[in-house]
Every structure is written in structure tokens, then in C-alpha cells.
């Protein structure tokens, strides 16, 4: 016995030593790859190594990437050591890029094999004998969707019309199987919930699901359930009768695909194949897997119950049920003990899921064209339809709005009068879910437009170019690069209005608008945004876009680097729902989770997830809740780390060879005091380039007036700086080649500046007006002033007595329209009047006068309100904003600006009239 024990210890020691040697060998190889290369390639390889370091905890023992290193995290997955098809698709993309840099594509191959083994249900998980019982003439039984979880279970309706599935037979004929080749979206990697593989309660990983009960069901209101429901766990009918009403229930399997993840996997495989050829590596067998996945992904192009698009009360007869877009899901299932099956598409389409890059690959690349008779043609149609979809949804500002549905309210209800449509499908501000609204998250903007930018890079399609030109202009106006080296990107967006009904031509959507309601530092979204900007910059030659991408990458790296990757602190206000969110369970229903947690009316999120009580971060959560505070966490999401790594690697690929030609400036930040005025000197290292000019916003400074060039020294004149509003301005040094550079200057006034004019009796308050322009383009068909009105006095001010004036040149006298997109006192309480001035002055022949209704109330001492305005000419002809007196091209957030005037009871109290 002693000898055996010693032998075992020796073997364990040997394995441990081999592991250390392999890790050291890998580090040595990576050091060799990165040692003489540019910093962006080095960053990619550093992050790749940290993601693969077992001590950092990104991967399970099965080699599956977790959603996050941390376990206490609730978003789409409700536990950190679940994973998603999204994470798996990023895994492929990461390894494709690693192969590009090192020539080693074995990690990419392993990623595909992991997907096939664990994420695509095997024949054991979706028995072919059951799937062979599917009838494409009767794909599934209709069940209406409802808004609230409390309206479930949803009763099956066997009499409702259901159309014909036109692709099933050709898929069976092409691939010789009845099973579906697509990823299920959610995996319990370590079997935390305890359902097990095929309900054995033990094995891992296990296919699970959560969302099932309508648009208002947040993750906090879900009941986790197994995909293989043999009725032995849960209640008397397993979990089935929580969701669907039927006369009797059968043991069954059911899986849901997230189409954006499968599309990303195909996109990643395309680039892996291109880069592998550079190294003489053959990836043809993995290309075939991606092609096959794309063939089945066509199910996402069809209405949920294969009803006609635009005539959704009628059953479809084939392709008349195809919207040709990437919808929110497709799903399938069948009997465990009986041979029957069903397949559904999805009626709801989100702009954030579209992928014209993947559509182009599957339609045009001979290696990727699906083997089925109609696969490539369907993807060619999808490409055209997706590009139209983006055009239809692009707001007046440039952001992409939500999406459309062929099943209004999820029940194929008649469309209300006046709703905008796309091929007969109704506009939806937030497709699929409303808690929170699905298109509030800025990340969808970055994700979806990254694919458009990549497609533009590959094809030069002018439709993509036009979409990106407008979108990137909007991005430049809303991303903040602060003078202290920090950055902010939009966090949440708010939408108003709707697009024009689609007739085949983009109208500019004058009635569809977006505003930013919060800012943050979502690192994954910032990485994806940088990726999009880089592809756009490379193709269009827009160096300002490249510089913005570079700033995001550099600032993330400098601010948020840690020993596991990158992470920013997150304040989680929603975590109060751990304790307070009741999960709806129908009266009379009772059952248990695998660990014994009771499922019954009145339970909370935590009640049916009691294993969280043993999580290492739970005491922190509990303490914050007891103190009435929102806890702050640092997370390492796998997809976000990949997005950052990939963006850095992409910078190396697209611009790495140009590093030696970059120019530099010193300093990159400075301060100008209006009370102690001095020129600012900047030293330039040209590296063979020439300075084309210096830009403030979209306008160039005047050499010899605003600045002087004296060899390697640029002098920014104090006279120019004195004319700027207090706050922060950015000056872009535009070089003939390589990177442009940005000088950030804080404008301060230690002398206090000009005193605002005191109002006359009877009102004693004093107003301070801060403002900025949401659209700083030189030429634009819309002017978008933003105002913050602050009462710095000691008495209340009736807002109905307050007026603001924004001065501008009309540039072609036409009738004009004003809109209040948002106001903290309610948009309906804001008025806008256009006044033609008796005598034109420099920068002004008109002013917009903002007023307030009596219902707006009063502005109390120390309080402020915000107004987001917008105006345009009735024929949408352009304004030249740089000529306008009140236009501020440099501010991207609220700053004091005395070229906006304010009046109380007709008396000037703030600002300088032109």
C-alpha cells in the first residue's frame, strides 16, 4: 500500500511538472512572437495567454469558456459559470487571430471540436428517431406569447394556422440526418443547478434554459429548467406546465439557438481560413462545419409558425414565410420516449443580431456556400434584406433603432393605424424583451455595426459606406475622451418616434431619434466599437476614426489592466432583485429544483437559487443590501476580454505596418486660464510627415491667426483660446500619414469670468446656461442644441417666464420645424419658436427661442433642468453650422457657454447677444 501511494505521488508530481513545463514553454513561444512586434500585437498575445492560464479560471476542466471568471453575476446568464453560444463564438474568433499571429491553428481546431462536443446537441441529445417524426407540413402547434410571466402557461391552440417548412427536406437530403446542426444558447458548464446531462443530475455540462415567459420576463423572473425534461425534476409535469398549457404532457427535449452567435462563429471561421492559407494550414474540414451551420441557420429567416410575412394571419406556403433576416432565435425539440418533433423560426427581428458579413460569406465564398440547393441563394437574399433593414432603422442622428416583428404583440394581432412597417412587419422600439428594453444597451450598436464595417472593408459596398459615414459621425459626437485620460461611451440609449415605412429608399428618418441617457465604461462594448472604427478607418481613410479607436484601446489598457485581463468597476443597482424580486409561480403549482429548493407561489430569485448563499461574493452582496447600498463588482467576462484582445490584434493587422510613420506631439494635454492668458507650445516629432492642419471639431484653425508653426514647435495662440468656452476642448493635429494626434486643453477662468446680467424685479433669480451641440458636423440638415438651465439664485423662478435663444444662420430661408427630443420636465412642456432677426449680424440671421408652458412648473434655487432640442428646415436642406454664432464645435458635454442667451420676463440675465 505504501509503495502504491508513493507511486501515485510520483505520478502526480510528474503531471504537475509537465504542466508547468508546458506553460513555461508556451510563455517562451509567446514572448518570441511578441518581442519585436508592435504593442497591439503584444497586447493580444498577453491577453491570449492570460485567458488560457488555468490559474485565472476562464476555462472549465472540459475546456469550455465560462461566461465570466466570477460566479456571482446576473445578466443574460444568471450565474457566472454558465456559458453561452456567444462566448463559444468569441472563443473561435480569438483562436483564429492567434493562428494569424503564430501560425498555430490547433487552438482554433480545438475550439470547433469543443463546440461540436458540447454546444451543438449530439444525436444522443436530439435522437434522430424523434427528429425523423417531424412533419414539415405541420412544424409546430401555435401558442400565443404574452407580456407578463403571470399570464403563463400559454394554452396550445391546435386550430391556429401554421405554415409549411420549406427547407427541412433539403437539409435532410443534403446531410443525411434529421437532427439540427446549430448551437443551443445556454450551458450549465459545471452542472451548478444539478439537472445533469439528459436529466442524470450528475454529469456536466448540461443544456438548460431560462427565458420562456414573455417580453416583461427579466432574468430576475425566470425559472431555470432542463432542456432534457423527462418529467422527473420540477413538478408533476416537470417544468413544462409552467410555460405551455396542454391536456397532457410528454417527456421531451427542446433547444434554442441564438442566431447572432452562430453567425459570429461562421464569420470567425472565414478569417481563420484566410489566415491559415498564409501559413499553409488546411482548415477545409472546419470550413465545412461552418458552412453546414450556416445552412441550418436559415431557420432564423422564417416566421415563428411559418406564417406569411406582412400577412401574418395566413399560413405560409414556403418562402412567403421568410423575412430573410437574422431573428432572435430558432428552436426545435421532440419526444424522449415517443417519435415526434417540432421546429419553429422567430417572428421578432433585432438590428443588433444582423450580420451582413456572414450573409456575404455564405452567399459568395465558394468554400463556404452551403451544400443544400437553396442555401447560397437564400443567403444572397438575406444580405440584400439586411442592408435594407439597417437603412430603414438608421435614426436621424445615425444610430440604429430596434427592429421589427411579423407577430404583433406575439399574437399576430392586427397592426394599429400609423405604425411604420418593413415589408409588412411592424416597427418595434425594443424587440423581444422590455425589462430592460432590448435596444437600450449601446453594445448592440457596436456589435452590429462592427459586422457592417467588416463587410464594407471586404466589399466596398456603398450602401454600407453610407450607413457607416452617418453612424461614425454620431459615434464621434457621443464618445467622450476626457482630459484626465479617462473615457466614456454611451451606456443606455433612449428612442423616440419611428422610421418612415420602408419603400426601398432611405429617407433620413426625420421622425426617428436617439439620445444618450447614461454613460459608462463597458469594456467589451468599447472593444467592439474600436473594432468597428478600425475597419471603417482602414477602408474610408478616416484617420479621426482610427485615432478614436486607438484612444479607446490605449485608455482601456492604461486604466483597467489587471492580472486577469481588463476590468472596470460596476455598480449594480439591480442586485437588490436578488432579495426582492418575486418569481411568478401559478397558484397550485409546486415543485423543487434539483438541490431541493422549493418552487411555489411567493418565491424570490434567491429562493430558487439558494446555492448563491455559498458563493464567495455573497457576503459582499448581503452587506451592501443590509446597508441599502448598491454593490460594486469587477468582472472578467470572457466575451469582453476577447473583444478587447481582438480589437488590439486587429489594430496590429490593419495599421501595425504604419507604426514607424506615426507623428507625435508633446504634451498631449494642457490647461489655459482666461485670467492668466499664455500661449500653449506643442513640440512635434514629424517622422517624415507634414502637418496638414489643426481641427477643432469639424473646423480647421487658421494658421497664422489661431496658431503659428515654428519648425518643430506649434504655438496655439492665447487669443484663440480666450475665445473658447470654459470646459474641455480637443484639437486634432491632422498629419499627412500615420496617426493623427489629439491635444486636450482644459479652459478655466480663475477670475470667475463675466458676471451674468442680473434679472429685474419681480424675479430675483440668476440663471446659468450650459450647453453643447449633439451634432458637430460642419454641414448638417439638423441642428441639435442641448441645454442645461441652472438656478444659481436664492428664489424660485417660474419656467413659463424663461426664454433661451440659440442664434444661427438659416442658409436658405425656408419654414422650419422644432422638436424637443427629451426634457427633464417633460418634452410636452417645452416650446420652440423661430424668429427672423430684424438685422442680420455675423453668425446670425435667425434665432430659435425656447420657452416653457405653465405646466413646466418652477425652477428652485440650486436646481437645474435639461432640454434636448433639434430643428431642421421643412425640406431638409442643409445648414452650415460653423457660421453660426451659438454653435460650439468643441464641447461634447455641458459647459458654460455665453453665446446662448437667457431671459426672465424679457430681461437678459445670461449670455451675450450677437
Curated annotation (Swiss-Prot):
- Signal peptide extent: 1-33
Task: List the GO molecular function terms.
Answer: cellulase activity; cellulose 1,4-beta-cellobiosidase activity; cellulose binding
What reaction is this protein's catalytic activity? Hydrolysis of (1->4)-beta-D-glucosidic linkages in cellulose and cellotetraose, releasing cellobiose from the non-reducing ends of the chains
Show where the CBM3 domain sits: 763-914
Q: InterPro entries from the xrefs?
A: 6-hairpin_glycosidase_sf, 6hp_glycosidase-like_sf, Carbo-bd_X2, CBM2/CBM3_carb-bd_dom_sf, CBM3, CBM3_sf, Endo-1-4-beta-glucanase_dom2, Endoglucanase_F_dom3
**Coiled-coil ranges from the UniProt annotation:** none
Question: Per UniProt, which keywords does this protein have?
Answer: Carbohydrate metabolism, Cellulose degradation, Glycosidase, Hydrolase, Polysaccharide degradation, Signal
Answer yes or no on keyword Transferase. Answer: no
Q: What's one GO BP annotation on this UniProt entry?
A: cellulose catabolic process
Q: What is its EC number?
A: 3.2.1.91
Family the UniProt entry places it in: Belongs to the glycosyl hydrolase 48 (cellulase L) family.
Q: What is the name of the protein in this document?
A: Exoglucanase-2
Query: What is the originating organism of this protein?
Result: Thermoclostridium stercorarium (strain ATCC 35414 / DSM 8532 / NCIMB 11754)
